[in-house]
Amino acid sequence: MFTAIWVMVGLAIAIGLILGWSAIRFKVEGNPLAEKIDAILPQTQCGQCGFPGCRPYAEAIAKGEADINQCPPGGEEGVKKLAELLGVEPKPLDEAHGTPKPKSVAFIDEQTCIGCTLCIQACPVDAISGAAKQMHTIIADECTGCELCLAPCPVDCISMVPIAEDLPHWKWKHPVVMMKQVGESTRV
């Protein structure tokens, strides 16, 4: 009996070592530039740029197949960050892909919702919870404001509500300078 256990343990260790070696040996390297570009994009997965999501758009920019000014949710600020990363001149946002809008989240009127689940299927980030024939709810922290859930709704119970700029959603608009850096630069 102990022989069978030791054989199984030995096989498990051998297979584990082979799999570990294979993972290191045949590791697929991603494009580091595409990963940096993807980190700058807003991750709304809205498709307004003409690509199915932010990652494919980042890969197309890295390959030179797409321009840096096709992301309306990223706005002019996103275009400037991409231009800085790639070392090119910033361009105005391409209006053919849409215009920047204030940040907003979807809101479902639960009294009108019929529970058809079409909005759940359309949401690229799974920000809608609910079941068939029951009312649905938006998970506001997950919603990216892509508006892809609006069109499939047969009863138009979904609306976009701007995010209030209160304390939890407030963002400092100016560059952050660390006090330690300021103190070091003023020393003689």
Curated annotation (Swiss-Prot):
SUPFAM superfamilies for this protein: 4Fe-4S ferredoxins
Residues binding [4Fe-4S] cluster 2, per UniProt: C113, C116, C119, C153
Gene Ontology MF terms in the entry: 4 iron, 4 sulfur cluster binding; electron transfer activity; metal ion binding
Gene3D superfamilies per UniProt: 3.30.70.20, Electron transport complex subunit B, putative Fe-S cluster
InterPro entries attached to this UniProt entry: 4Fe-4S_dom (IPR007202), 4Fe4S_Fe-S-bd (IPR017896), 4Fe4S_Fe_S_CS (IPR017900), Elect_transpt_cplx_RnfB/RsxB (IPR010207), RnfB/RsxB_Proteobac (IPR016463), RnfB_subfamily (IPR050294)
Residues that coordinate or bind [4Fe-4S] cluster 1: C46, C49, C54, C71
Enzyme class: translocase
Cofactor(s) demanded: [4Fe-4S] cluster
Localization per record: Cell inner membrane
GO cellular component, one term: plasma membrane
EC number assigned by the record: 7.-.-.-
Chain intervals for the UniProt region annotation (Hydrophobic): 1-23
Keyword annotations of the record: 4Fe-4S, Cell inner membrane, Cell membrane, Electron transport, Iron, Iron-sulfur, Membrane, Metal-binding, Repeat, Translocase, Transport
Biological processes, Gene Ontology terms: electron transport chain
Binding positions for [4Fe-4S] cluster 3 per the UniProt entry: C123, C143, C146, C149
Domain 4Fe-4S ferredoxin-type: 104-133, 134-163
Domain 4Fe-4S: 29-88
Subunit architecture: The complex is composed of six subunits: RnfA, RnfB, RnfC, RnfD, RnfE and RnfG.
Family as reported in the entry's similarity comment: Belongs to the 4Fe4S bacterial-type ferredoxin family. RnfB subfamily.
Summary of the function given for this chain in its UniProt record: Part of a membrane-bound complex that couples electron transfer with translocation of ions across the membrane.
Protein name, entry field: Ion-translocating oxidoreductase complex subunit B
Organism: Thiobacillus denitrificans (strain ATCC 25259 / T1)
